[in-house]
Design a protein with these regions (language model features):
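Conserved phosphate-binding catalytic cores of ATP/NTP-utilizing and phosphoryl-transfer enzymes
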Residues: 1, 107, 111-136, 301-302
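Short glycine-aspartate micro-motif
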Residues: 3-6, 73-75, 136-140, 262
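A short helix-loop
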Residues: 8-9, 16-18, 23-28, 130-134, ...
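N-terminal phosphate-binding loop and adjacent alpha-helix
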Residues: 33-66
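Short beta-strand-loop/turn "lid" adjacent to the catalytic site in phosphate-handling enzymes
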Residues: 60-99
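Glycine-rich beta-strand-to-loop/alpha-helix junction loops that act as flexible
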Residues: 76-79, 142-144, 262-270
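Glycine-rich phosphate-binding/hydrolytic loop that grips phosphoryl groups
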Residues: 118-122, 287-315
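A contiguous, well-structured pocket-lining segment that forms one wall/lid of small-molecule binding clefts
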Residues: 190-261, 267-284, 304-312
Length: 315
């Protein structure tokens, strides 16, 4: 049995097909939304337009790589997070496409959230199959969240901590755009950071399970004004994010000892952050970039789980 996942976030249009019998992702595709040089993202109306324009061709591409006539359920990100009042218009494009696809074939439509998709993709790809069935601490770190969550799979989520102001992805993107890189700028900031061989000493603000990242933007601006080069400042920015996560994770582990700690979200694609955190947090799980950044893989997996089609008893 195949399931189709659709996610239309403020960053990318994403589709994925999951095979419940094999327990594998058959194929996936993603297209970043076009952002003009110097801008930090799109207005919601523009994001909705670009998703609507991209989806037909992307579904056609997906159909060339998988037999969509074998899809038996459709999952879609209908809103950002599974909390009351969570809403962004960009997700309407995905809901519209998913609804049309499911109705045309009399298939069940499963409405999920963008955050649940991130969590499911990370748990699936973390290298330990049991993670998707048991309790874990999950960080969702992106341009719109810096959340620490207590999760049982991706279905039962309890918020534990977050940023009180700026999100990690916002800090990274603002630095990257300031340096002249396209949005989203995470990959370029990571490339620059890898060029720096100097030691940096990040200064962070963490109180229990809550962090503050608003000072990071000002710190980076001051470092640039003081004459530090781009690689140094990029490394400083990413290690500040890394040290923030280390402190939040270890504080959470003091309250929930022994739990695995899984890192999801686009910012967690950084090799520098991955190395820094895994050396300091026990039982930390990072995943390959395509499972960390925006994707529809987790949504296709959750559609299968909601239908009771995966995991199968033979696995």
């Amino acid at each position: 049995m195949l399931t189709l996942g659709i996610d239309t976030s403020n960053y990318a249009t994403s589709l994925a097909v999951f095979d419940t019998d094999a327990g594998e992702v058959v194929c996936d595709c993603k297209k970043f939304l076009p952002v003009k040089e110097g801008q930090l993202g799109l207005r919601q109306s523009d994001a909705l337009f670009h998703h609507t324009a991209a989806l037909p061709a992307m579904l056609s591409e997906l159909g060339a790589r998988a037999d969509l006539t074998q899809v038996r359920a459709v999952g879609v990100s209908a809103r950002p997070r599974p909390v009351e009042g969570s809403y962004m218009p960009c997700f309407l494009a995905g809901v519209s496409a998913a609804t049309a696809f499911s109705l045309s074939r009399a298939l069940p439509l499963i409405e999920l959230t963008h955050q649940q998709g991130h969590i499911a993709a990370a748990l699936y790809a973390a290298g330990d199959f049991t993670l998707i069935e048991r309790e874990s601490l999950v960080f969702h770190v992106s341009g719109g969240t810096t959340d620490l969550l207590l999760c049982h799979g991706a279905e039962r989520i309890t918020p534990l901590g977050t940023s009180s102001d700026l999100y990690a992805g916002q800090a990274v993107d603002r630095l990257g755009v300031k340096l002249g890189f396209p949005f989203p700028a995470g990959v370029y900031v990571s490339e620059q950071a890898a060029l720096c061989k100097e030691k940096v000493h990040p200064k962070v603000s963490v109180h229990g399970l809550t962090c503050s990242l608003s000072g990071l933007e000002n710190q980076c601006a001051k470092l640039l004004a003081d004459g530090h080069d781009a690689p140094y400042v990029c490394k400083y920015c990413l290690l500040c994010v890394g040290e923030t996560l280390v402190r939040m994770a270890n504080n959470a582990l003091a309250e929930h000892p022994g739990l695995p700690v899984v890192f999801a979200g686009g910012v967690m694609s950084s090799d520098l952050i991955r190395t820094y955190v895994t050396n300091r947090v026990p039982n930390a799980h990072f995943v390959p970039g395509k499972f960390a950044s925006d994707n529809a893989i987790g949504i296709s997996i959750l559609a299968a789980r909601e239908c009771g089609a995966w995991p199968t008893t033979s696995m």
